[in-house]
Amino acid sequence: RDMTTPESRDRFVGIQISPISFVDEGVDTVLDTLKDRVGINVLMLGTVSWLGLKSGRSISHELDGWPDHGVPEPYQMRGGAYFDPDPRYYTDTFMADYRSRDPEFSGRDILKMVVPAAHERGIKVYVELMEPFFKYAGHGSAGTVEIPTLAQAMEVDLLGRLGGDPSTSNPGYRRWIHSMIEDQVRNHHIDGVMWCNERNSPLDTLIQGGAPGDFSEPARKEAVERGINVERCRQALLRLYDFMQEAAAGKQFPDGSLITFLRVLLDNPEALIWEKFWLERNKDLDRELYGLVKWCKPELPFGLNVWNRNHFNPIRRAQWPWAEQTLYADFVKPITYQHQAGEVWSRELSFFRTTILRDFEPDQATRALFRILGLNEAPFDELVATGMDPDSYVHGQCADALRGVDGKAKVYMGIGVDAPRTLPETAKCSRDIVYRSVMATYRAGGHGVVLAPNYASMHLTHLDGVAQAL
C-alpha cells in the first residue's frame, strides 16, 4: 500500500449538518467549532426533509448514546422545509405548503440564519437534499407527513396497490422538486447543491422481496409514449415476482435458484425493458435538476451524493457508471461509511441470499461478490464487527471513482463519522478510523471529503481525527 502523506493543497472539507444543530448549540458556536477545531470549509446543510438523519438529532442514540455536544434529548421532528418557501415558485404543484411546523423553527429560516454567518468566516454553504424525502426505513422518518393529497401521488405497484414513495412521474410531485430547488438557488446566496437519489429499481425491489412499480397513470403514459407495452412488462415482472416469493419461501428448484432466476428472466425479457425505462426516468430527474441549477446560476456547483449500494450491488454497479454521471454532475460524493459498511454489506447480501443466491453460504457469496466488485475486506463472519478498512475500502472506492470520472468531475469522499448503527455488534467509529479515512482519500488523489451523515450524531473527539489528518 502507498502510505505516503497527501500533498498539502487547498482541500474541500465538507460536513453534512441538520438545521437543529444550529438551534441547539447556536450558529456562532457551531460554525466556530467546525472551522477552528475540525477544519471545515463547506457546510452541506439539510434544508428540506422528513428524515431525522437529515433534519434531526441522532437517530441511533438508544444504541450509540448521545455525542459530546448538542442537546441529549430525542427531537420530535415533523419535517418539511426549514427555510421560508417563496409562494411564487409553487403555483403549479399540490405541495405548495410544506414549511416545517416544528416549534423549534417557528419564525426561523435556516438559510437566513446560517449563510451570512458562514460566509463571514469563509465557509461555503451547499444545500443537501435526499430523495426519497419521506418514510425511508433506517433514516429516522417522521411518522406522519402533513401534506394533503400526497398519498394520492404515490407509486402503484404491479399488484395495483399504492406504493410507499411518491411517483417521480407524477407531474405535481416532480414540479415540486424542481420548484423547491429553484427557490433556494435563486433566493439565497448558497454556494452549491448536493442531490442524493436513493430509489430502488424494479429489480432491486424484486430481489428485496417486494412488488415493484411504477404503474401509476403518469408512469404508464410515459411508457406508452416510448413505445412500451405496459401490460406485457407487468406480466413479465409478475413472473419474476412469483419466482422471488417461491425462492424466499424455500421452494427447491432442480437447477438451483440462480439458474432458475436467469431462466425466468430470459423467458420474460420485458422485465428488463421496464427496468431500463424506470432507470432512465430516474436518471432524468438528476439530469433535469443539473440543468435547472445551471440555467439559474451557471457557476453554481451541482453534485451527486452516491449511494453505497452502487458499489455493493453488481446490478446497480452496472447501471450507474461514473463516466455517465459526469454528464450531469460537477462532483460526486461516494458514500463510504467504513465502520458501518459491514452491517450495510450484510443487509445487501441477505437480499440476494434469500432469493437468487440462496444456494451459497454467506462467506462463499461474499468472496465471489467481493472479487466481482473489486473489494478486499474481512471474511463475512468478521465483517459486521470490524467494518471495512479505510486503507483498502475508502482508498479503493476513491481510486475507482477517480478512474471513472476521468478528470471530468471532482471526487469528494463521503467519510462516515458515527453513522447510525442498528446492531450492537456493528463496529463503532473512532478517531483513528476517521483519521485514516481522510488520509486514504488524499493518498488516492481525492479532491476532498464530506463528513457524514449528520453532525448532530458525531463525536467531536472523533472529528479530531479529521483535524489531525488535515
Regions found by a protein language model. Give the residues of each.
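Substrate-binding cleft/loops of secretory-pathway carbohydrate-active enzymes
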Residues: F134-V145, P202-D204, C296-W345, T422-R443
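Aromatic- and acidic-residue-enriched segments that line the glycan-binding/catalytic groove
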Residues: L53-G80, F133-G160, C196-L262, W345-D363
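Catalytic domains of carbohydrate-active enzymes, especially glycoside hydrolases
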Residues: D28-G56, G70-F83, D183, N187-G192, ...
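Aromatic- and acid-rich polysaccharide-binding/catalytic face
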Residues: C196, R234-L272, Q319-T386, G446-S457
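Aromatic-lined carbohydrate-recognition surfaces of secreted/lumenal glycan-active proteins
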Residues: Q16, I123-Y136, M194-E198, N229-P254, ...
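Substrate-binding cleft of secreted/luminal carbohydrate-active enzymes
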Residues: N41-L53, Y328-R347, G374-Q468
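Active-site-adjacent "subsite" loops/lids of carbohydrate-active enzymes
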Residues: S8-V23, A81-P116, Y126-H188, P212-I228, ...
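An active-site-proximal structural segment forming one wall of the substrate-binding cleft
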Residues: T33-I40, V114-A117, G164-S201, L240, ...
